[in-house]
């Protein structure tokens, strides 16, 4: 037991290691490129399926051939070691080939959300000084406008139909006529590949400093920044998940519903499964209303999503009478899941013969998406899991390297293989978040408040910037209220934000946004809010009581599919409370 007389520190005690096999605790991270690791791990499985895209299957042998063809084409287009190409696309086989091809030749992909405005895309192109742009045909005109007044010389255009089976490709092209007026610097994907037929496919030597990608932070707590993630980062995430060997097995499948322009989408949704010999089923542009049908069609053992995906599955009528015992590890990351929502999802899974509860994780772009995992039996309600086997997580006095004992709340910091190289061309911002502590390790200062229990499970309270500080100095964690409100059976989703205190010059008060279950009649809304007020009075201290409640049809989301807290704050009016 931890006592006040004998404080125990997580970075020294590492209590979570009792849940891992010694061979994984002692493993050495591979010193190779991300592409090399996938090839090594599957050298005896070349005939097995690596990727599936609307029924078209690519074996590992096909995958390797396509990566090398793409590498030659990138070289023919002028991309060389150290260069950065900008990619504006959803997830398709071509984007996966381009990722590993750029990695193979020592180049980097700058991954940009295709929903960005012309100015947004232009800023990201200029930030990394790309001379090559790869984009979807459906966003070509926006990308063309964005590329003006930049150094882009060549634009490679791909279509979602490029890898479809022939009948589907023909149907797609008929239904979605390409009306773009392409300019002289454009080359289409198949022409792009053909242009590289005489180029070398020799791989560049492994460089531990090489950044595979630049991915951009969501901007929910500040201006977006380009995060450089290396081969070691991607390989570190994949190899640490191999320690979950009771869940992950060669020959299984993973439904990839996350986009390529967030670290979670590529690190966990592509490189992790390919490294572990798990087939990736690519869904390029998810319609969340069809998620249940997709799961039933493909029956994937694994999926990485966000909490709202699983909340939707739990009420999907298409799955209500289905046996889902094929599910092994469905993980909710990217945002916190309230305890009531977690219980609802777990009740649904148990009722449909799923062996394990919803898996959860915690991380951030700057940690290559994942630092903890609550998976299989190693799962506690309300926690975000155990640190990955070769990763350290501990609580510190905010903004310092003073570690706090296990059980005490502080700023969660992360050290391990997933820690980013840094922000692109932002040394001051990098120095603010990556700090070398007295132990000599580099730690990511997350800006999140939380703690570890005696078993090493991590609990997340809130981002420091989401803390609601009252006029009297009392601090309110939004999660305290969300965990209570979400227990009400009528509440589908909830989010707590701060609003102005009308009675004091300074300070903020908690305000609750609600999305109710669709089956709840409008006539019962006032009664439900009354019940929620009473629930909070019974379970929360006086200083934590919400000042108001507002029912909305759906939660606004950021581009990374997280609840947009800033937008919710902006929409509160004095009449709401």
What are these regions (language model features)?
Residues 59-61, 212-239:
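Conserved AMP-binding A3 loop
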Residues 179-216, 223, 246-253:
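Conserved pre-ATP/AMP-binding loop-to-beta segment of ANL
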Residues 158, 538-563:
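AMP-binding/adenylate-forming catalytic domain of the ANL superfamily
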Residues 235-253, 261-304, 308, 312, ...:
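Conserved AMP-binding/adenylation subdomain of ANL enzymes
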Residues 301-305, 314-381, 392:
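Gly/Ser/Thr-rich phosphate-binding loop
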Residues 1-58, 62-77, 81, 162-181, ...:
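N-lobe entry segment of adenylate-forming
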Residues 53-58, 70-116, 128, 137, ...:
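Conserved AMP-binding/adenylate-forming
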Residues 116, 133-135, 303, 416, ...:
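AMP-binding/adenylate-forming catalytic core of the ANL superfamily
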